[in-house]
Amino acid sequence: MEEKVESTTTPDGPCVVSVQETEKWMEEAMRMAKEALENIEVPVGCLMVYNNEVVGKGRNEVNQTKNATRHAEMVAIDQVLDWCHQHGQSPSTVFEHTVLYVTVEPCIMCAAALRLMKIPLVVYGCQNERFGGCGSVLNIASADLPNTGRPFQCIPGYRAEEAVELLKTFYKQENPNAPKSKVRKKDCQKS
């Protein structure tokens, strides 16, 4: 018997995920995060799963594209929209039945986008203490925000330690896109 992790209500009934599904999809999200790290990106990876099928996936592409909005979730949202177009599906119907699996708590921008898309459930790894939009900084996920889509359920903490270790590895590196320092060093002469 499959152990159920969580459920939330969608327009057509409950959205339920099992421990086995969560492990399977979070493994793939971690793979995406590692791919981001290999490409000198903040290591965040995600999958959007509709009817047990990955319809969108993403990893951060901010440094690669020089576009600050290309977070993993935004890349995945674009892929879901493309999938809907290719399969003749209504994006609103698909998003209302899609679960997001992501290695790090979505930032405020991404949480707002997920809410507007009416994603019912987000499963994430570690908290985002600086920019988290699911409770760490702001709670976009469940706040009473008129005309901003539908609140969504969050399940935090899946493989959080692994996600934190990936982030630590990234932040130990030098950022090749950081601007050159404009501080001039004085010449020191011995007297």
Curated annotation (Swiss-Prot):
Q: Which cofactor does it need?
A: Zn(2+)
> Any idea which positions bind Zn(2+)?
H71, C107, C110
One MF annotation (Gene Ontology) recorded for this entry = zinc ion binding
Reaction(s) the record says it catalyses: adenosine(34) in tRNA + H2O + H(+) = inosine(34) in tRNA + NH4(+)
- Classification via Gene3D superfamilies: Cytidine Deaminase, domain 2
Give the EC class as a word: hydrolase
* Active-site residues, record numbering mapped to chain: E73
GO BP term, example: tRNA wobble adenosine to inosine editing
The CMP/dCMP-type deaminase domain sits at: 20-145
Lipid biosynthesis as UniProt keyword: no
Cite the InterPro entries for this sequence: APOBEC/CMP_deaminase_Zn-bd (IPR016192), CMP_dCMP_dom (IPR002125), Cytidine_deaminase-like (IPR016193), tRNA_aden_deaminase (IPR028883)
Q: Which UniProt keywords apply?
A: Hydrolase, Metal-binding, tRNA processing, Zinc
| EC number assigned by the record | 3.5.4.33
Q: Which HAMAP family match?
A: tRNA_aden_deaminase
Sum up the protein's function in the record's words.
Probably participates in deamination of adenosine-34 to inosine in many tRNAs.
Recorded family membership: Belongs to the cytidine and deoxycytidylate deaminase family. ADAT2 subfamily.
PANTHER family, alphabetized? CYTOSINE DEAMINASE FAMILY MEMBER, TRNA-SPECIFIC ADENOSINE DEAMINASE 2
The name under which this protein is listed is tRNA-specific adenosine deaminase 2
